[in-house]
Amino acid sequence: MAKANTVRVRKKVKKSVSEGIAHVHASFNNTIITITDRQGNALSWATSGGAGFKGSRKSTPFAAQIAAEAAGKVAQEYGVKNLEVRIKGPGPGRDSSVRALNALGFKITSISDVTPIPHNGCRPPKKRRI
């Protein structure tokens, strides 16, 4: 009788990272939070839409807070303690996402605004008339 082939599966080892970078992309429609290590490899990410908010509720500070908590909890499993926060965009989730990360117990070492500013590049969208 032939011997059955057995496949050994190695247990996935989670890497231990003590310092990370939280990239907060706050647009007018959504907020995306990505937590990476120092080299830029993503450890965790979350969005307002992925946290269960749809439509105009995605662009609220509360939705950004929930998304930051979701990304932060996964990053804590990797052992992240210190965070450097880089905020990009003009959206309403800028401040609340940083507050949520601080409330989770992360030590925030620096907060920097990396919003791209054009040197008279593309024409901006026309002003809204309501």
UniProtKB/Swiss-Prot annotation:
One of its GO terms (biological process) is translation. Disulfide bonds: none annotated. Pfam families: Ribosomal_S11. Keywords: Ribonucleoprotein, Ribosomal protein, RNA-binding, rRNA-binding. GO terms for cellular component: ribonucleoprotein complex; ribosome. It comes from the Bacteria. GO terms for molecular function: rRNA binding; structural constituent of ribosome. Located on the platform of the 30S subunit, it bridges several disparate RNA helices of the 16S rRNA. Forms part of the Shine-Dalgarno cleft in the 70S ribosome. Belongs to the universal ribosomal protein uS11 family. Part of the 30S ribosomal subunit. Interacts with proteins S7 and S18. Binds to IF-3. This is Small ribosomal subunit protein uS11. The lineage of its organism: Bacteria, Pseudomonadati, Pseudomonadota, Betaproteobacteria, Neisseriales.
